[in-house]
A protein has these predicted regions:
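Long, intrinsically disordered, low-complexity Ser/Thr/Pro-rich regulatory/activation regions
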Residues: 243-273
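Structured surface interface patches that mediate subunit assembly and partner/cofactor docking
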Residues: 202, 236-241, 254-257
Length: 273
């Protein structure tokens, strides 16, 4: 009987098909009270001239997580931001070139740290505001089925992405299945606001912020306004009373009544996941 080493030496990798694997990175930020997403404009086929989520093929010497960190730095110029694996998109026909499986990640990037530019394979890069992501039965179905791709096929709401200059694109205008990926990411973030500290990942300075800044982030992700009093009471109950935010003193140099500044104390047990 041959040893494992002998078996591996004679193993024929051509016995099985080898799908390509990519990482797609949804780089979100909050600016001007809106949730914004970094997209790149493709300068190559397929989907030449279409806007797309930045990403790239997985290298043979890196893990998916390492590839995601690399691409966030290449596209947005940042490191050490909150990132998490979103979902694996594996529809057989999702890429017209060949069989490609995409591992999607979302990244929460403070706007003040964002330094984006068009990289390899892109003519342009821009921040788009994100609107039109619907809720309702489709969300319940995706959770029950544990299959966002199937649930999104039944989604009647359309995704609307708008540049500050006013140019808008819909989900149908995006490359590949990136509209589905974006919808899935927005819903993931909305669902996690109440039981994780995800919103704090968007703060420009977690050591010195106001509750108004934090509320604006929540509203941007949720896509609607929140009652100011209820929000403050919830944050004070869930965070200040638990010692996860602490007062730093009143804001200086502000017009009108100064706001209280807070500092976020990261709790590894809750953090972002």
């Amino acid at each position: 009987m041959q040893s494992e080493q002998q078996y591996l030496k004679t193993y024929d990798p051509s016995l099985f098909d080898h799908p390509s694997v990519t990482v797609d990175i949804l780089i979100f930020t909050v600016a001007d009270k809106k949730l914004r997403l970094l997209l790149i404009k493709r300068n190559t086929y397929p989907f030449l001239g279409k806007w797309a989520v930045p990403g790239g093929f997985l290298r043979m010497d890196e893990s998916a997580d390492e590839a995601a960190v690399r691409r966030v730095y290449e596209e947005a110029g940042v490191k050490n931001v909150h990132m998490e694996q979103l979902y694996t998109f594996s529809a057989v026909d999702r890429d017209p070139r060949t069989r490609v499986i995409s591992i999607a990640y979302l990244a929460a990037v403070p706007f003040g740290r964002l330094q984006y530019s068009a990289g390899v394979g892109a003519d342009d890069a821009a921040l788009f505001s994100v609107e039109g992501v619907t809720e309702g039965e489709v969300i319940k179905e995706s959770i029950a089925d544990a299959d966002p791709e199937k649930a999104l096929d039944r989604d009647s709401g359309d995704l609307i992405l708008t540049m500050p200059e006013g140019m808008a694109v819909t989900g149908a205008d995006l490359a590949f299945d990136h509209a589905e990926i974006i919808r899935t990411a927005v819903r993931r973030m909305r669902g996690k606001l109440n039981y994780t500290d995800l919103a704090f990942g968007f703060l420009n300075d977690p050591s010195s912020f106001t509750l108004t800044e934090l509320r604006i982030i929540h509203e941007a992700i949720l896509g609607h306004k929140l009652d100011i009093g209820n929000f403050r009471r919830t944050i004070k109950r869930d965070y200040e009373a638990a010692g996860r935010i602490v007062e730093r003193g009143l804001e200086k140099g502000s017009v009108g009544r100064p706001a209280m500044l807070y500092s976020y104390i990261r709790d590894p047990a809750r953090a972002f996941t």
